[in-house]
Swiss-Prot record:
Family annotation (Gene3D superfamilies): HUPs
Biased composition (Polar residues): 199-214
PANTHER family with a match to the protein in the record: CYTOPLASMIC TRNA 2-THIOLATION PROTEIN 2
InterPro entries assigned: CTU2, Rossmann-like_a/b/a_fold
Pathway: tRNA modification; 5-methoxycarbonylmethyl-2-thiouridine-tRNA biosynthesis
Keywords: Cytoplasm, tRNA processing
Family matches, as Pfam families: CTU2
Name of this chain's protein: Cytoplasmic tRNA 2-thiolation protein 2-B
Domain of life assignment: Eukaryota
Keyword check for tRNA processing: yes
Length: 512
């Protein structure tokens, strides 16, 4: 019997292997399967491309946030997801596309090499690769360095007025009727307006590359290094980088006239962000941070068309259709698992996904059910009710029995500086280290008295998560000037409002 078993074992193994290799596509039922996305979801190469393209355009179509002829900025990082997003937009704008995308795209790449500790020579090498890739897309592109945050205006932290748009269906119908009435001449003109600009025209791409990829001033580079050096933890550095990147994207979008910004976060990335943001105290803003449309900025909306794709699907698409991402070192590259909350969460979710394939999809579906309930119409238009850094609605207006109030009380009791209002009022006009004495000799402990008085007024304008980020910074003076100026502006407005409060009419009095 043993000999018979040994004789038949190779045949049984070959039969199982032939059966697994002989799977056919679940869609066309004809071609052999080239990949397996999930258990039972086998696709051939052509059907997988059709499935991938359909999901992208269906995501944009069912949400109906991009109007015909609208300018959309594509946030490109060189990674797999944003590279696949750019390819989808590029193919959707071609003349042969069955359901053509009708918006006007532009691409933005932000050079974050200084924050990641890269030299200018290393950054130049990456920028040359980025520029060559973007030139092949024939889409207008912008390449800026992160150092430009030190030249941003304070208005970038102010919420813009949202544009009143007509009904989406009526706008599309009007656009199609206008196309038919204008005939062939109108169609060709519209195609020229919607067709992406040819970057290969003489001097166009070279001029853009030279103007956007020039070396930033050394003063700004040193300031950026000092800013990230002041953050004591990698968690705070990653949060700070995300905040500065968002401010720069918002400024470029407003300056160049883009009303929408596309980012390339995948389903896997958003699932990781869901858990990490809860750990970072951003649970109140999960619908904004993980939803399809983020409208916190008012005049510019952040949309995430790649949120339906897993990282596995994106990797398959890039592999089969020659989409070449560019590897760029990040802050957590070669870092240990416990180096930051974000990196630890990423390792945890990826390992869990390997053993339980429904982990990412479960987290993603959970995030879809979350809605923002703390914003009302009055708070949306009030700048003082929004965080100074992330521009999210403040989540610090909690009751005395809340966990936030308990945390604040514990923090105040643990401080060496007395928190009495009378003491703060008496010492508000005094300079630090008066009489030649140090702060420690003056009875204030090891903390500088001037910073102790300035920090509460600044922290009061931040949400709970941004307060934790600022708490991990050694100094607030290294922040960009537009942040400090906006904080001072809000303080002055608050003081002015207190002075004229008794002369203001309340809403009830006005209605009566």
């Amino acid at each position: 019997m043993c000999e018979e078993g040994e004789t038949y074992c190779p045949e049984v193994k070959d039969a199982k292997q032939a059966k697994s290799l002989g799977k056919i596509c679940m869609k066309c039922k004809e071609s052999s399967a080239a990949l397996l996305i999930r258990a039972g979801d086998a696709f051939c190469k052509s059907c997988f491309k059709e499935y991938f393209v359909h999901k992208f355009r269906a995501t944009l179509g069912k949400n109906r946030v991009i109007y015909p002829g609208e300018k959309v900025l594509l946030a490109y990082s060189g990674g797999p997801s944003s590279s696949a997003m750019v390819r989808q937009v590029q193919e959707g704008l071609s003349r042969d596309a069955p359901k053509k995308l009708r918006f006007v795209p532009g691409i933005l790449f932000i050079d974050e090499g200084t924050a990641c500790g890269m030299s200018w020579e290393e950054r130049q090498q990456i920028l040359s690769e980025i520029c060559s890739v973007l030139q092949q897309t024939k889409i207008p592109f912008h390449i800026v360095s992160l150092e430009q945050v030190f030249s941003l205006p304070g208005s970038v932290l102010q919420r813009g007025a949202p544009e009143q748009r007509p009904n989406y269906k009526e706008e599309v119908d009007r656009f199609l009727v206008q196309e038919r009435e204008q005939g062939d001449a109108g169609c060709s003109e519209m195609l020229e307006r919607l067709e992406v600009t040819d970057s290969d025209s003489p001097g166009s791409s070279d001029k853009m590359y030279q103007s956007t990829c020039s070396r930033p001033p050394d003063m700004h580079t040193q300031k950026l290094k000092q800013l990230f050096a002041s953050a004591k933890t990698l968690t705070a550095k990653q949060q700070l980088l995300h905040t500065l990147r968002s401010h720069l994207i918002l400024h470029i979008a407003r300056t160049c006239g883009y009303s929408k910004v596309m980012t390339g976060e995948s389903c896997t990335r958003l699932s990781i962000r869901l858990l990490s943001n809860v750990s970072l105290g951003r649970g109140a803003f999960l619908p904004l941070d993980t939803g399809f449309c983020d409208s916190r900025y008012g005049d510019v909306d952040i949309i995430r068309p790649m949120r339906e794709y897993s990282s596995k699907e994106i990797a398959y698409y890039n592999r089969f259709f020659n989409v070449l991402p560019i590897f760029i070192p990040a802050l957590d590259t070669k870092a240990s698992e416990n180096s930051s909350i974000q990196h630890l969460t990423e390792v945890f979710v990826n390992r869990l996904q390997a053993d339980f394939p429904s982990t990412v999809s479960t987290l993603y579906r959970t995030s879809e059910k979350l809605n923002v309930s703390i914003i009302d119409a009055d708070q949306e238009t009030c700048a003082k009710d929004r965080c100074l850094l992330c521009l999210s609605p403040l989540d610090t207006q909690a009751g005395k029995a809340s966990a936030f109030s308990a945390t604040q009380l514990s923090h105040h009791l643990s401080q060496k500086i007395p928190m009495k209002s009378n003491d703060l009022a008496n010492n508000s006009d005094k300079s630090c280290c008066q009489g030649g004495q140090g702060c420690k000799e003056a009875g204030y402990g090891d903390t500088c008295q001037s910073r102790a008085l300035q920090t509460p007024s600044f922290v009061h304008m931040l949400c709970y998560s941004c307060r934790l980020t600022v708490k991990d910074m050694q100094s607030l003076d290294v922040l960009p000037q537009y942040v400090l100026h906006e904080a001072e502006y809000r303080c002055h407005r608050t003081e002015m409002r207190k002075e004229i409060q008794e002369f203001l009419l309340e809403e009830d009095d006005g209605d009566s």
